[in-house]
Amino acid sequence: QAATLAWNAGHRNAAIITPQADNYLRLQNTFAEIWLNKGGRLVSRSTFSGENDYSDVIKRVMAIDSSEARADSLLDLLPRTNMEFTPRRRNDIDFIFLIANPGQGRQIKPTLAFYFAGDIPVYATASIYDGLNNQSTNQDLNGIVFTTEPWVLNSSDPLKTEITSNLRPVQGTLQRLRAMGIDSFRLYARLRQFADKEIDSLQGATGTLSMSENGIIHRNLDVARFVNGIATEAESS
């Protein structure tokens, strides 16, 4: 879905940043395959490990390290007196596809700005948002577009309010598991209607649900953007 959003926004050159774990690498490969099939171009694929400094990976993605290396070579040949150097980032990236949790995202987005890439659109997976309205903490995520479940995004849902008041509050993955349970219950009563084509979609807690010709359930997530530290519903086209 992130690939479709980026493509419809007119972007064609993608950079991918993901954690260095097998399950995330599979997601990276899936996104890359979808993007290339659309006719897009991948200009950078990078991974990170750990929870500390993201400078190296961002410098690599934006080719800042190459710019610094060229400057060092030049300075080795010329007198260094009164010479100043400002690194330049590559200019062929239309957007960045990011897989990260909120803590990682809060470090990666400002690091992009530090390395002259704060103007590049960032599209992320649902993992970037834990469902908590930490406005001050989430300021560092401003501008990131991501897809997520309506249940996580909509804090005013009457059923969510009722469940939250009667059960232990949860966040992140547990919120999403709760939403899956709700949709499983709702879908069971509607499977015959789907099969008989009496309905073609159902607005669920995990997204807009539909059934393919071979009986597979698909879902379309809501689109959101961080604005002033708040996850706000955004246009899906």
Language-model regions: role of each:
Residues 38, 116-117, 194-198:
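Bacterial peptidoglycan biogenesis and beta-lactam-recognition machinery
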Residues 45-46, 235-237:
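Short hydrophobic alpha-helix segments
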Residues 14-19, 44, 120, 174-177, ...:
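Surface-exposed patches in mature extracellular/periplasmic domains of secreted proteins
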Residues 62-73, 91-93, 109-182:
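Extracellular/periplasmic periplasmic-binding protein-like sensory domains
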Residues 165-235:
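Segments of small-molecule ligand-sensing domains
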Residues 1-103:
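Extracellular/periplasmic Venus flytrap/periplasmic-binding protein
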Residues 18, 100, 124-127, 148, ...:
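Active-site proximal loops enriched in glycine and acidic residues that flank catalytic Cys/His/Asp
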